[in-house]
């Protein structure tokens, strides 16, 4: 089935690496941008480039995600501190920066993510225990990859998984104001029952070869076409 966003849902762009792309996407009312700080990623962005981008076009109404995977704790803390300091010095935010999020895809325990005392999202898969969700004081979003949910559906385990997930959410006290996020590729064809199980607040799409003319050379017309087709 063709994916079209429901009312209230947002698009998030993963692997953002230049100002021009962000500016173009902002014109399409996209306000969620993830920066890939995983050194082995094709979309890896160095800290100084990230800081230059935010210094030039930081918007207090946007949401910015710093994506890490199996990174050293002190590296995460330094980059987070530098980003928050830049935002505060820009005069566009108070000391409490609420639109900078950590993003993790390494399958570690939630208490590790909680140790940064910063709003975060994590990519949920078979490495996590659903009962650990109750530890999520700073947890703001859970990301499901479409490939993982499709695997559960194909193996006949999706219904059981959803039941366990919703059961754990109901046990959380106090209830968290938490978003559900679905990450998928531009040409993924989601199975119909997926949206009976979940109401996603955010759908994330990557900057990859499907929207590039060559490596890190965005085909802006094609990207616009894809994004407009989801809105």
Label every model-predicted segment.
Residues 6-12:
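Extreme N-terminal starter segment of soluble prokaryotic enzymes
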Residues 12-14, 34-42, 61-164, 178-184, ...:
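Catalytic beta/alpha-barrel core
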Residues 25, 203:
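Conserved, mostly hydrophobic/aromatic
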Residues 47-57, 208-231:
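C-terminal helical cap(s) of enzyme catalytic domains, especially alpha/beta-barrels
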Residues 161-171, 186-196:
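A short, acidic, amphipathic alpha-helical segment used as a generic capping/interface helix at domain edges
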Residues 196, 200, 215:
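Residues lining hydrophobic/aromatic ligand-binding pockets adjacent to catalytic sites
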């Amino acid at each position: 089935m063709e994916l079209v966003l429901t009312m209230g849902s947002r698009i998030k762009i993963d692997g953002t690496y230049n100002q021009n792309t962000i500016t173009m996407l902002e014109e399409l009312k996209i306000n969620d941008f993830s920066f890939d700080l995983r050194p082995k990623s094709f979309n890896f962005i160095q800290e100084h480039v990230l800081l230059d981008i935010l210094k030039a076009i930081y918007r207090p109404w946007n949401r910015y995600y710093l994506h890490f995977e199996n990174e050293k704790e002190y590296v995460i803390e330094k980059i987070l501190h530098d980003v928050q300091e830049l935002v505060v010095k820009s005069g566009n935010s108070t000391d409490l920066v609420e639109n900078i999020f950590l993003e993790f895809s390494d399958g570690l325990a939630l208490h590790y993510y909680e140790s940064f005392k910063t709003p975060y999202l994590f990519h949920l898969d078979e490495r996590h225990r659903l009962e650990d969700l109750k530890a999520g004081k700073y947890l703001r979003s859970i990301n499901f990859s479409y490939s993982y949910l499709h695997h559960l559906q194909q193996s006949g385990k999706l219904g059981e998984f959803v039941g366990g997930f919703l059961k754990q959410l109901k046990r959380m006290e106090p209830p968290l104001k938490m978003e559900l996020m679905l990450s998928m590729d531009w040409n993924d064809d989601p199975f119909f029952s997926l949206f009976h199980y979940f109401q996603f607040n955010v759908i994330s799409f990557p900057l990859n070869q499907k929207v590039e003319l060559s490596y890190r050379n965005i085909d802006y017309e094609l990207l616009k076409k894809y994004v407009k087709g989801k809105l």
